[in-house]
Amino acid sequence: MQFTKLGSSPLVVSRVCLGTMTWGQQNTEAEAKEQLDVAFKEFGVNFLDTAEMYPVPTKAETQGRTDLIIGKWLKESGISRDKVVLATKVAGPGISWLPGRNGENSRVRKRDIIVSVEASLKRLGTEYIDLLQIHWPDRYVPIFGANAYNRSLEREATPFEEQLEALNELIKQGKVRQIGLSNESPYGIMKFSAAAQQLGIQPFVSLQNSYSLINRAEFDSGLSEVCSPRNENIGLLPYSPLAGGILTGKYASEQDTSSCRLTLFPGYMARYKQSLAVEAVKKYCALAKEVGLTPTELALGWCYKQSDTVASTIIGATSVAQLRENLEAFDESKWARIDNARIDDIHRQCKDPSKT
């Protein structure tokens, strides 16, 4: 396993981060703990990402289960807490049943951030969070597959300064070490950056956005410039590098997908099942076969090899076999077979087909 500093922070993270959003829904506690043991004890991963709303699809009766599982593992694993870089996320607006919100829709106001972190710390059984991220913006932003900005959806939002004040308070209390953003735009990052400088608050060090072979143009343009070490020095943490599993090729083959996420939860991540996305996946699968890689190795290897852009790629699995394949794809001898020029050619033919 390789390691890198996360953005401008002193956090040293593995270049693969273990995602957790299926734990407590598709995966049992025992299965989740086995995944943690494999990733941390066999492959040397040290980076773990969760969220207050997990597992996904999110619902009141399961919310928080993922954190509880992680908390038990942290206590039982025998791994020192300081050897685990633990990241979590404060939910954006729109969920009415999160702890401490008194039945109101979640927001990213100061009190929401503080209540969220206190509840997360309790579930996780830890005294601090290494990386606290805002899961999605309090203001309107086209995310989760939406493409064009729709001005009619603009709304009043929590000031950037208020959000930063809450985060800074938690940092001063020792409950949060570093802060990051998720599903954010260039405008949002720069507004936060300017406000943080004005208030004398430490900067955001990471950006967790969707990034994959079929969803890359948004980052490759404006966000890449913003996050560059020459500019804001923010580390990219790609989520959905396999586009919900679509890029494994299993949904386009004769494999049994009855137990897979997109089959179990119709409508979930439907953006990845559009006809143009399916066509792009077929092209990437054909390229993978030609160069002697699995579709998974091609899709993940493309992310992994971008060390100048990607800090750590977030992977998720519903079985240990899947997890091992994802981790074994972190292999420079496999990356050597990946021709970025040919990948870029497919991208030009099917540019961001998951966008609506």
Which functions belong to the PLM regions below?
Residues 1-89, 111, 127, 172:
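N-terminal binding-site loop/beta-alpha segment at the start of enzyme catalytic domains
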Residues 20-30, 99-111, 151-157:
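Active-site mouth loops of central-metabolism enzymes
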Residues 32, 66, 113, 117, ...:
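Aromatic/hydrophobic pocket-lining residues that form the small-molecule binding cavity
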Residues 56, 137-345, 352-354:
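Beta/alpha (TIM)-barrel catalytic core signal, keyed to glycine-rich beta->alpha loops juxtaposed to Asp/Glu
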Residues 57-61, 92-107, 140-149:
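Surface-exposed, active-site-proximal loop segments in enzymatic domains
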Residues 109-128:
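An active-site-proximal structural segment forming one wall of the substrate-binding cleft
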Residues 122-145:
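Active-site groove signature of glycoside hydrolases
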